[in-house]
Design a protein with these regions (language model features):
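Phosphate/dinucleotide-binding and metal-coordinating scaffold of catalytic cores
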Residues: 2-229
C-alpha cells in the first residue's frame, strides 16, 4: 500500500512539474520573440590576405586617447570616487556569424563613454566596463552590438573568477528561455589602446527601453517614477 502511494506521489509531482514547465515556456509572454544563442550561430571563415590577430568572435576596440579610466581610490582611510567616465573612440568588428581580423575595416566607428563597473570586482586584474555609445556632441546614440538590438548602454563583463567563461553566458540564456526578459549576451574579444584584454561578455545593460525592460519611461517633472528592483 505504501509503495502504491509513493508511486502516486511521484507520478503526481512529475505531472505538476511538466505542467509548470509547459506553462512558463508557452504561455508566459517573452519580451524577445526569438533568443539567439551565440554558440549556435554558424561561423563563416572570412577569406582575407590580412595578417595579425584573427578570431571567430566579434572584436571591440577602445582608444582612451591616453586617458586613464577612473577608479575609486582610498585616501586617508576614505574611499574617493573619481569622475564617472571618460570620452573614448570605439570600433566594432562584430558580425557574430563570421571571423574577424583586427586590421579589417570596422563596421562602426563611434564615440563612447566608459567607466569601470562593479565594486570589489573593479580591483580584479580583468575589469568589467560599462559602455555608452554617444555622438560627437556626447548625446546618446544607439547601435547594434554583435547582432543584439540597438541600444546605447552596454556592459563588457570580464569573467575573472569564472575560468570556464560559461557561468554568466549560460545563466543569461537559460533565464531568457523561461522569463519575459533576460539580458542578451555575446562573447567578444576586447582591445584597449591596442592591448589585448581577453575574452569578454558583451551584455545588455538592464534598463528601461523597448528592447530592454518594457516599463514606462520616467518623467522628471513627476514625483513618482517607475523603477527596477
Amino acid at each position: 500500500m505504501g509503495r502504491l502511494m509513493r508511486g502516486k506521489v511521484i507520478y503526481g509531482t512529475t505531472l505538476i512539474g511538466l505542467f509548470l514547465f509547459l506553462f512558463f515556456y508557452f504561455w508566459i509572454p517573452k519580451h524577445h520573440i526569438e533568443r539567439i544563442h551565440h554558440h549556435r550561430i554558424k561561423q563563416v571563415d572570412a577569406k582575407s590576405d590580412l595578417t595579425g590577430f584573427k578570431t571567430h568572435l566579434p572584436i571591440i576596440s577602445i582608444d582612451t586617447k591616453q586617458q586613464v579610466i577612473p577608479l575609486v581610490t582610498k585616501e586617508g582611510g576614505k574611499y574617493v570616487k573619481a569622475r564617472d567616465n571618460i570620452n573614448v573612440d570605439i570600433e566594432l568588428r562584430d558580425s557574430p556569424s563570421r571571423s574577424h581580423h583586427l586590421s579589417e575595416k570596422p563596421r562602426i566607428r563611434t564615440k563612447g563613454l566608459i567607466s569601470y563597473r562593479g565594486n570589489s570586482s573593479r580591483y580584479f586584474d580583468k575589469k568589467s566596463l560599462k559602455v555608452k555609445f554617444v555622438t560627437n556632441k556626447l548625446k546618446e546614440k544607439k547601435h547594434r552590438l554583435a547582432g543584439m538590438p540597438k541600444e546605447s548602454e552596454w556592459v563588457l563583463h570580464g569573467p575573472f573568477l569564472d575560468r570556464t567563461l560559461l557561468r554568466n553566458y549560460l545563466s543569461y540564456n537559460i533565464a531568457g528561455e523561461i522569463m519575459s526578459y533576460a539580458p542578451n549576451v555575446r562573447y567578444c574579444e576586447l582591445f584597449v589602446n591596442g592591448e589585448y584584454q581577453g575574452v569578454y561578455l558583451a551584455v545588455e545593460n538592464i534598463e528601461q527601453g523597448e528592447q530592454r525592460v518594457p516599463i514606462e519611461k520616467s518623467d522628471k517633472k513627476l514625483h513618482k517614477t517607475p523603477y527596477i528592483v
